[in-house]
Amino acid sequence: MSMEGVFLEKTKTNTTTTLPDLSLHISLPDIHQYHHNESSKESSRRSSQLENNNRSSNFELSLSHHNHPTARIFHCPDRRTLNLPHQQHYNNPIINGVHQRVDESEISNLHRPIRGIPVYHNRSFPFHQQNSSLPSLGGGDMDQISILNSSSGYNNAYRSLQSSPRLKGVPLHHHHHHNQYGVVGSSDSSSPHHHNHHHHGMIRSRFLPKMPTKRSMRAPRMRWTSSLHARFVHAVELLGGHERATPKSVLELMDVKDLTLAHVKSHLQMYRTVKTTNKPAASSDGSGEEEMGINGNEVHHQSSTDQRAQSDDTSLHQETDISSTQPRWSNSSRETWPLSNNCSSDIDTMIRTSSTSMISHYQRSSIQNQEQRSNDQAKRCGNLSCENPSLEFTLGRPDWHEK
């Protein structure tokens, strides 16, 4: 029979005078004392169970040496011991009376500071904000602990966590995820410098325009109209003619928008070619009027290249024909140039015709040189036969074959 709650009372008697009272007085135990004994037993049983479970789930978070005597051990309870409060009430209804007292003791044990890592009780744990399904670090007992606040403390904690093989219920890839994007610290306005630098770097690389590409140095194609050519001729005449004019000075005198030095240089070169090939007759008044045109220039250039192979009569005949068919133009700015506006295409055709004429001239000259060489060789031989000499020779007397 259990003797709990049974109190034996002995009456004070004088042993010398009377006999001792050996009667038993049985009464009901005190209710408050009974609940106190039950709660103490349950708390001791629960604390022993926690100690047995914590032996397999302890890992060191100290940043000091392993042999240092002041290193502290952070006890991470097992997943089974960190059930939600309502699950504990359903599974063990006897502990309902002492649950609040046990939670306070657990919180006091879990809130012990870790050496090397600051502990702040007014901020929530960062893993609990990001993922509430992490039981060992994001539970209700740990939501008031903030292990890290700066990037340096965060990196040190990450190195110490990497030393252990595996956290109970916390995979390390979540930790690496937070470190990669710089989402560290609490939810207040203070954010790490690394996160700000990374964020601004992404914005700078995304929204800034690229470096401007190098502009092509080739000038755009220019169409020389009649009025533009008249202005060009007027500038050349003011500078003393095509022989003394320079492209830069002509460009300054023309003062035309979007006209480059390359345009003036090419046009002046073509103008000099036309002026040198076509020998104009100087007028008495010095106005310098010539009879020329685009097609006339082509024929003049072709006739000048073919003068060596043709006679003077044919060249004069071509000039008279061209002068009678083509209109005349003046180099003064008051008159217009009644020719085709597509000067560039005419220049290309003129270059092609001049090149073909030069090739034909060289072919004719080579044929003439060959004929001249053959004639010289015939003159050297004269009337003598140029056959191969006989290489036969005899020894002794020439008539020994006959004998």
From Swiss-Prot:
Keyword Kinase: no
Pfam family, one: Myb_DNA-binding
Major location category of this protein: nucleus
Subcellular location: Nucleus
Stated induction or repression of this protein's expression: Repressed by AS2 in adaxial tissue.
GO CC terms, sorted: nucleus
Keywords attached to this entry: Developmental protein, Differentiation, DNA-binding, Nucleus, Repressor, Transcription, Transcription regulation
DNA-binding region listed in the record: 247-272
Spans annotated as Disordered: 35-54, 273-345, 357-403
Record has DNA-binding as a keyword: yes
GO molecular function: DNA-binding transcription factor activity; transcription cis-regulatory region binding
Observed phenotype of the null mutant: Flat leaves. Altered morphology of abaxial mesophyll cells. Decreased number of trichomes on the adaxial surface and increased number of abaxial trichomes.
UniProt tissue specificity: Expressed in developing phloem and lateral root.
Biased composition (Polar residues): 274-286, 321-343, 362-372
Extent of Basic and acidic residues compositional bias: 35-45, 298-320
Residues in HTH myb-type domain copies: 216-276
GO biological process terms, semicolon-separated: abaxial cell fate specification; adaxial/abaxial axis specification; carpel development; plant organ morphogenesis; plant ovule development; polarity specification of adaxial/abaxial axis; radial pattern formation; xylem and phloem pattern formation
Note: Plants overexpressing KAN1 develop elongated and pointed cotyledons and do not produced subsequent leaves, resulting in seedling lethality.
The protein's role, per its UniProt record: Transcriptional repressor that regulates lateral organ polarity. Promotes lateral organ abaxial identity by repressing the adaxial regulator ASYMMETRIC LEAVES2 (AS2) in abaxial cells. Required for abaxial identity in both leaves and carpels. Functions with KAN2 in the specification of polarity of the ovule outer integument. Regulates cambium activity by repressing the auxin efflux carrier PIN1. Plays a role in lateral root formation and development.
Annotated protein name in UniProt: Transcription repressor KAN1
